[in-house]
């Protein structure tokens, strides 16, 4: 076989292997008829994502709380590792809910308000928690749920690693935005 043909075949096979199939990760047709929602994360997928997050946390000497929500805000799966205080569990839920409200990562929202006092005041009146650890769960370009992780300084890494392990490629993480030093305006 000519090298160019082998290369083309390898590219086609690799693309097919990395493609996501939404039907593997959402509720069944029967369940979707009852809920009138087709692209909702399945309980099985949510449990696998949670376990992947727990595995990441354990490997990195962390203890976390994890919430996976459906696009309508229903708890599909939740887990609190030993050693979590109530605030960690609550913030994990708030992060997942914030993703549903904003359709974006909580880190991206934190960046948006980092150096803008007016936005900080506006956002403080909304039911959002703009700090790292909440991500949309995206499959085939559709948000099928949200994950919120609380309890450590690598919450977003934990969530992202779990999502990419279980459902495949996800949107890139938001960059870190430097926060201006407090002090008088210049």
Model-predicted regions and their roles:
Residues 20-186:
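Flexible, solvent-exposed loop/hinge segments and secondary-structure transition points
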């Amino acid at each position: 076989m000519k090298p160019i043909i082998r290369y083309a075949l390898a590219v086609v096979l690799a693309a097919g292997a990395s493609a996501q199939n939404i039907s593997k990760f959402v509720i069944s047709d029967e369940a979707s008829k009852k809920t009138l929602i087709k692209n909702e994360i399945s309980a099985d997928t949510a449990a696998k994502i949670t376990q992947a997050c727990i595995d990441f946390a354990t490997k990195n000497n962390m203890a976390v709380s994890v919430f996976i929500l459906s696009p309508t805000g229903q708890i599909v799966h939740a887990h609190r590792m030993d050693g979590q205080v109530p605030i960690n569990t609550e913030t994990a839920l708030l992060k997942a809910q914030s993703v549903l409200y904003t359709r974006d990562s909580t880190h991206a929202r934190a960046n948006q308000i980092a150096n803008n006092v007016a936005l900080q005041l506006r956002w403080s009146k909304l039911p959002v928690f703009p700090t790292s650890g909440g991500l949309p769960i995206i499959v085939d370009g559709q948000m099928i749920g949200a994950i919120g992780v609380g309890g450590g300084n690598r919450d977003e890494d934990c969530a992202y690693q779990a999502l990419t392990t279980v459902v495949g490629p996800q949107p890139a993480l938001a960059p870190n935005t430097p926060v201006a030093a407090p002090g008088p305006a210049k």
